[in-house]
Amino acid sequence: MSRLHPHPVALSKRQRSIAELLVLLIPLVPLGCDGSAAPRIGPDSANAAEGVQMGVSSSEARFVRTIIGFSGPESVRYDPDDDVYYVSNMKGAGSVKDDNGFINRIRASNPDSGSVLVQGGKNGVTLHAPKGLAIHGDTLWTADIDVLRGFDKHSGAPLAMIDFAPLGAVQLNDVAIGPDGTIHVTDTGIIMSPKGVIHTGPDRIFVVGPNAQISVAAEGFQLRRPNGITWDPVGKRWIVLSFDQFAGQIMENPQGSTPPKLIRTRDGGGQLDGVEVLRDGAVLFTSWADSSIHMLANGRDKPIIREVAVPADIGVDTKRNYVLIPLSMLGHVQLWSLDGVVRPQK
């Protein structure tokens, strides 16, 4: 069991009401416009309608563009080897095994050129509600409820399936690769149905080692619904975020299977989702509570992008110095430049 000792965060009655409403609405909002398996990707011609103009005026980072046509986009991963973006699409409630999830492959040099790389229910593929993405060699890994699936990142062909159901996995969420090649997977412990979201637990962090052996690195309520996870090559540690709506925790643990320890509890509330570490060690993370992307550096936490509704599992385009933000409830992915905020990521 984790030995982490969180400190509860006091929120106003209004903040608590908003947070609870957001959690309940997630699976009820239609994700996709036309019901097709692969909505057409393209540029957004109505930025003002989603609050982009307000966010631009109050953000330190620079807004570049919005790409539309996704269906519940949950995670964006940049592959510097091929200069492409991968986007996972849940298309519906996040715990329903409906075999209609899909993953887009998009050329970073021309984001309107996206295509469907992996489609549930076709070509021998099973894919329900893909969430976190990670790349290891030529394999694209994604968390899919209680299974970790691996696909060829070029052809989309299924390569591997690691079943966590025998361990009682509830909601596998984010995926990250360690420097030793192990795969770390968070289990947020929530059920996302068309009727709402229920936290059943257990909250866990799994590690997949050689020969697909699964072990538990940390477990317990103290993890507060672990969500985003990433390896920090600068600090030589894992960074883990909590999705608890009232206690926004940022946690760390060194390489190995020791339980995470608390780095910071956010005064502004919880519902932390995606996390990335930049080359200088700065930590970027998303917050549903204040609809922002934050940067944690030198002990200081500051929002650098504002007015982004329900930002999910972000990626970083290291060639262009962009942060890539999936907006699940809108079916959009936004691109923001970090120039002027942090140095280029090459």
Regions found by a protein language model. Name each.
Residues K91-S95, V147, I190-P194, D244-G248, ...:
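Short glycine/acidic-enriched loop and turn motifs that connect beta-strands
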